């Protein structure tokens, strides 16, 4: 028996008896004795025909010889012989039920599940029996998803004795959290943002961790039998690095409180004390954490919650720390990573500095630069960007295009293309006077086609001034913005009605569990059960990853509930104590919205890679509920949006830990510590910038630190909190209020059609993804969506279908390498040639900004109108 086979046997946790109805669970000792009595057969014992058939089952059409087999084939070859026909058929029946409407399972594979579960198998047909057993073993002991198999070894290979929560892991995590969180906070307020990503951190953690393990002495002390030491007598492991990466990564996203603090300080002139900043940040930072515990059962434990856009983190971790078979042909993952990283580190200089036309490749406008219609339709600067070859810049293409499922990317693009066509139709028919404005601008405009200056309708204390408003102008949207807002409004009711129809059983069970749990808390027994650390929440999940994770102590629900309850109490006190003019019921309303939307949004992201926030929904609802109160709107928006954003960030980390077998309690402690420390780092950066950077958040700021994100946040607070959605929906753009009804009716239509006429739709088609694609809006035209589509087609469709072996080995590693190379190159470019601007003045840098595309002129000239403006007359504005 080989080392791998012996380890697989020892680590297995469940053996199923010959009878499919009599499942017996054995201890690890029993399992070891069984396998020693019946040794696992090596792949070499199979005939060439059987091995080729196994390759065919796993879709390895690109394997041309049997001397270079993928690891999955080797693994399955040691397991197929031990499973019975009866057990295999039982697994097929469970797969048919579980993977129904699973978009990440191909129709061909699902039909195989159905065929075996309904027709059975002829025991005399050795080929069919072999295929049945291979599929069953794949489901029982590995994963049916190539994406997961590409980055995760078989779960039974896990070694739970590997140390994870070490001093050196926490030391590196704190150091990198300070640097990454501070850097990302600073550069998030720059005109062109730069952000350190987890792939960059991983790349540096590897030499730091291995060096520490090799050279730092193992000095330490014992406390009650537990050893605390600077170092341990063990190499730096992949589990340690993954633990370290995960607790750092939750601190590298958007620190949403900064929007509130900077808007209040800079635009509203408020004196914001550090106490207020800290307690508000604490609430916003941890409220999503409490909800993450609820989401675990829906988007962490289930196998179908793949989280495709997060898998490159695991791939890079394995490439750096898991040795590969030296007999495999081609580059190792380690070599491929650094080769791709070096290439992108150099290449980024061309679209970012040397040859900027590669970034905005509006080549069709170069043919006729003064053709206004050509620039409007195909341009990438001010046009809608219908261009088949729009960019060669990886910052535009993005590593997500290598990870997003093809069905998801294509469906989104179809929605984006449709909304661009609607935008063009609205513009050229002058719908709502949009022809007097640029077609695709994210600015607000006056009735004289000038950029709207929000401060002109505010009093000295930043409140809405109706007299000034009547003299100035209502705000008007460009065609692109108008269609985008309509799509946003329709998406929320569509999503709820569609998912309630398609998955009403799951949602009923989820909400029933919520309310029953809360109701049962009136009993003493419920509190005792809630505090029970031995609750086995994974017992109901039978996939191999969940069975392997059952060996670790799970975080009990009461840990998450405690965080949630404490943070809500602190939030109420903060809102009241600091006189924010925000009613407490508004806080609970925002929590309620997340209570309704959080599960479908998380499931959408976990299965398709598509994300959607609640910021616009919160803005509109709170604008109606709290008219003329922009400060309250900003606070409730921060709570309402960040609950979902933070919860998704936490549970995606939990899923990666689930894949990599990182102890849940260790991750919980690490996440809590890092999220708390991050508050001080980000607040320190924010306040330092305001006090020490001359012109920070103004057009005169050096290094382009003009805070466009804060400007947008401020504008939204005035438009939705000061002016209010009632004026916009009822009078300026009445069509927008009907988008709620349109979304609801379309949700019912598509939900019923998919539910009762599913045979007419492909399994992967999800109309919610189509609507999310329709949320494309200025300033990002179709040119930002076409290059990712082409790259996704090449990676997720062509390579995955015809070169699966190479795709599994390199795809996610290259995605991580390109991301790391891009970020580091952007940092070098900024400090070397952009902070103190240096330019190369030549055709390749100038041509994108010559001609009509750069001008952004409207179809109609407001000066040609008799009144010199459009819409209602001054003094009669809605």
Predicted segments with their positions:
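Alpha-helical multipass membrane-protein architecture
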Residues: 2-878
């Amino acid at each position: 028996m080989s080392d791998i086979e012996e380890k697989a046997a020892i680590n297995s946790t469940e053996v199923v008896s010959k009878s499919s109805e009599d499942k017996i669970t054995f201890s690890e000792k029993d399992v070891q004795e069984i396998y020693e009595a019946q040794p696992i057969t090596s792949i070499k014992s199979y005939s060439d025909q059987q091995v080729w058939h196994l390759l065919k089952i796993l879709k390895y059409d690109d394997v041309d010889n049997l001397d270079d087999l993928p690891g999955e084939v080797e693994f399955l070859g040691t397991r197929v012989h031990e499973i019975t026909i009866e057990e295999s058929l039982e697994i097929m029946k469970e797969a048919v039920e579980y993977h129904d409407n699973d978009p990440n399972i191909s129709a061909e594979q699902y039909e195989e599940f159905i065929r075996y579960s309904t027709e059975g198998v002829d025991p005399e047909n050795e080929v069919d029996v072999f295929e049945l057993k291979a599929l069953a073993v794949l489901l029982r002991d590995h994963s049916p998803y190539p994406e997961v198999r590409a980055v995760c070894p078989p779960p039974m290979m896990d070694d739970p004795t590997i140390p994870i929560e070490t001093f050196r892991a926490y030391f590196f995590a704190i150091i990198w959290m300070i640097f990454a969180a501070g850097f990302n906070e600073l550069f998030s307020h720059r005109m062109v943002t730069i952000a350190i990503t987890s792939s960059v951190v991983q790349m540096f953690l590897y030499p730091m961790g291995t060096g520490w393990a090799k050279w730092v002495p193992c000095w330490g002390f014992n406390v009650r039998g537990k050893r605390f030491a600077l170092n341990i007598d063990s190499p730096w492991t992949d589990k340690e690095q993954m633990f370290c990466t995960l607790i750092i990564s939750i601190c590298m996203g958007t620190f949403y409180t900064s929007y509130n603090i900077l808007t209040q300080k800079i635009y509203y002139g408020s004196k914001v004390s550090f106490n207020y900043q800290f307690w508000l940040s604490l609430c916003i930072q941890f409220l999503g954490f409490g909800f993450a515990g609820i989401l675990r059962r829906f988007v962490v434990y289930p196998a179908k919650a793949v989280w495709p856009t997060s898998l490159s983190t695991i791939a890079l971790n394995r490439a750096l720390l898991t040795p590969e078979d030296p007999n495999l042909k081609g580059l190792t993952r380690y070599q491929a990573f650094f080769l791709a990283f070096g290439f992108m580190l150099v290449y980024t200089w061309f679209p970012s500095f040397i040859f900027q036309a590669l970034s905005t490749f509006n080549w069709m406008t170069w043919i006729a630069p003064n053709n206004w219609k050509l620039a409007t339709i195909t341009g990438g600067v001010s046009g809608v960007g219908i261009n088949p070859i729009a960019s060669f810049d990886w910052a535009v293409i993005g590593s997500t295009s290598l990870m997003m499922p093809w069905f998801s990317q294509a469906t989104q693009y179809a929605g984006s293309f449709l909304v661009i066509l609607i935008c063009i139709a609205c513009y050229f028919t002058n719908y709502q006077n949009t022809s007097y404005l640029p077609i695709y601008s994210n600015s607000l405009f006056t009735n004289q086609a000038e950029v709207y200056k929000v401060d002109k309708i505010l009093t000295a204390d930043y409140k809405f001034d109706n007299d000034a408003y009547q003299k100035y102008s209502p705000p008007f949207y460009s065609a692109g913005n108008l269609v985008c807002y309509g799509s946003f409004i329709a998406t929320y009711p569509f999503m709820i009605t569609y998912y309630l129809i398609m998955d009403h059983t799951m949602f009923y069970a989820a909400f029933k569990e919520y309310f029953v749990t809360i109701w049962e808390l009136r009993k003493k027994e419920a509190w005792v059960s809630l505090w029970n650390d031995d609750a086995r929440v994974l017992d109901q999940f039978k996939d191999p990853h969940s069975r392997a994770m059952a060996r670790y102590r799970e975080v009990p629900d009461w840990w998450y509930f405690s965080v949630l309850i404490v943070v809500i109490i602190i939030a109420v006190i903060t809102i009241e104590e600091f006189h924010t003019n925000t009613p407490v019921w508004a806080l609970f309303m925002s929590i309620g919205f997340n209570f309704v939307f959080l599960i479908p949004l998380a499931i959408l992201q976990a299965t398709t890679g598509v994300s959607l926030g609640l910021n616009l929904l919160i803005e509109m609802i709170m604008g109606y509920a709290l008219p003329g109160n922009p400060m309250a709107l900003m606070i409730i928006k921060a709570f309402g949006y960040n609950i979902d954003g933070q919860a998704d960030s936490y549970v995606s980390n939990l899923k990666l830990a689930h894949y990599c077998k990182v102890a849940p309690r260790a991750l919980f402690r690490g996440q809590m510590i890092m999220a708390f420390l991050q508050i001080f780092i980000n607040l320190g950066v924010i306040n330092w910038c305001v006090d020490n950077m001359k012109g920070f958040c103004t057009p005169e700021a050096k290094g382009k630190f003009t805070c466009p994100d804060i400007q947008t946040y401020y504008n939204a607070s005035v438009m939705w909190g000061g002016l209010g959605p009632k004026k916009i929906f009822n009078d300026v753009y009445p069509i927008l209020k009907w988008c709620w009804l349109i979304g609801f009716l379309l949700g019912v239509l598509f939900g019923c059609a998919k539910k009762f006429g599913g045979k007419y739709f492909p399994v992967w088609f999800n109309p919610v993804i189509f609507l999310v694609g329709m949320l494309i809006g200025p300033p990002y035209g179709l040119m930002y969506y076409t290059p990712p589509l082409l790259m996704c087609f090449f990676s997720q469709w062509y390579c995955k279908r015809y070169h699966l072996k190479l795709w599994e080995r390199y795809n996610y590693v290259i995605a991580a390498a390109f991301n790391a190379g891009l970020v580091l190159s952007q940092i070098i470019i900024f400090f070397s040639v952009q902070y103190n601007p240096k330019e190369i003045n030549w055709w390749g840098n100038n041509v994108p900004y010559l001609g009509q595309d750069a001008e952004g002129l409207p179809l109609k000239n407001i000066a040609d109108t008799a009144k010199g403006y459009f819409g209602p007359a001054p003094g009669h504005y809605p």
